[in-house]
C-alpha cells in the first residue's frame, strides 16, 4: 500500500493525473489492447480531471484506446438532469477529451430491470478484460461509491437504498429540497473495485481525515468500506495535508519519507508525443546488415 501526501489539493490532483497519464502511456494501448479504468464523480476528482484534459489538449495524452466504467448512478434521475452522474462525467471530462462514447460505461438508473442492468455492467467489465486502474473517492464516513457503512466488503454491482446521512449531504445539489434527492442508486460493489488490478483512492480535506485514519491505521471494517483496500495488493492513496490530521505523526513522517521513491512513479512524466517521435526516428533508420 502506498500513501502519497501532498501539501495542497491542487498538488494531490496533479500527482494523481500524472500517475494516470504514465499508467496509460506505459500500457501502450491500441485497437486490440484497451486501457480500462474505473472512474468516480464528486468534487474530489475534478482537479485530476482538469489536469488530464490539459494533457490531452497539449497533445501529451490520448484516450482513444481507453475504456471507462463509472462507479455509480442515481435511480430515477433522467440522464440529462444536471445532477445525474452521466451529465457530470460528460460535462466535466468526457466531452473535453478524445474518448469514444461507446467506450464510456455508466450505469442506467432508469433501466426497466435495475438488477439486470447491474449484472450486465459486471459482465461488460469482464468482457473488457477487467479493470486495470480503478480510481475512487470517499465520503467522510469512508464510503466508496455508494457502499455505505455496513456494506459487504465482497459486494458486487447492485441496487442500493441510500442512508439518510447521504440524502441530507446530497440535498445541497438539489436546492436543499429533500423531496428532490434520489433515495436509491446503482453502485459497483466493494468486491467489484477490489477485482481491479490496481486501485487509487483520492482523499482530500480535513472533513475526510478520520476516514483516512480508519483506512490507514485501523483494521479492515465493513463500517468503513474504504478500509477494505488495505487488503488489495496494489492500492495507492493520494491525499493532501488536511486529510492527514487524524494520522499519527510517525505515520505521516514514515510515508513522507517514501515520497522520493513514490515520485519516481510520475517522474519522468511520459508523453505520447515522445513516443511518436521515437517511432518516426525508428522508421527513418537506414537498413544495415
From Swiss-Prot:
This is Glucosamine-6-phosphate deaminase 1. Belongs to the glucosamine/galactosamine-6-phosphate isomerase family. Homohexamer. The keyword Flavoprotein does not apply. It comes from Mesocricetus auratus (Golden hamster). Pathway: Nucleotide-sugar biosynthesis; UDP-N-acetyl-alpha-D-glucosamine biosynthesis; alpha-D-glucosamine 6-phosphate from D-fructose 6-phosphate: step 1/1. Its main location: cytoplasm. GO terms for biological process: carbohydrate metabolic process; generation of precursor metabolites and energy; glucosamine catabolic process; N-acetylglucosamine catabolic process; N-acetylneuraminate catabolic process; UDP-N-acetylglucosamine biosynthetic process. It catalyses: alpha-D-glucosamine 6-phosphate + H2O = beta-D-fructose 6-phosphate + NH4(+). Catalyzes the reversible conversion of alpha-D-glucosamine 6-phosphate (GlcN-6P) into beta-D-fructose 6-phosphate (Fru-6P) and ammonium ion, a regulatory reaction step in de novo uridine diphosphate-N-acetyl-alpha-D-glucosamine (UDP-GlcNAc) biosynthesis via hexosamine pathway. Deamination is coupled to aldo-keto isomerization mediating the metabolic flux from UDP-GlcNAc toward Fru-6P. At high ammonium level can drive amination and isomerization of Fru-6P toward hexosamines and UDP-GlcNAc synthesis. PANTHER family: GLUCOSAMINE-6-PHOSPHATE ISOMERASE (PTHR11280), GLUCOSAMINE-6-PHOSPHATE ISOMERASE 1 (PTHR11280:SF8). The modification Phosphothreonine is found at residue 161. GO terms for cellular component: cytoplasm. It is found in: Cytoplasm. GO terms for molecular function: glucosamine-6-phosphate deaminase activity; identical protein binding; isomerase activity. The keyword GTP-binding does not apply. The modification N6-acetyllysine is found at residue 64. At the equatorial segment of the sperm head. The lineage of its organism: Eukaryota, Metazoa, Chordata, Craniata, Vertebrata. Its EC number is 3.5.99.6. HAMAP family: GlcN6P_deamin. Gene3D superfamilies: 3.40.50.1360. Keywords: Acetylation, Carbohydrate metabolism, Cytoplasm, Hydrolase, Isomerase, Phosphoprotein.
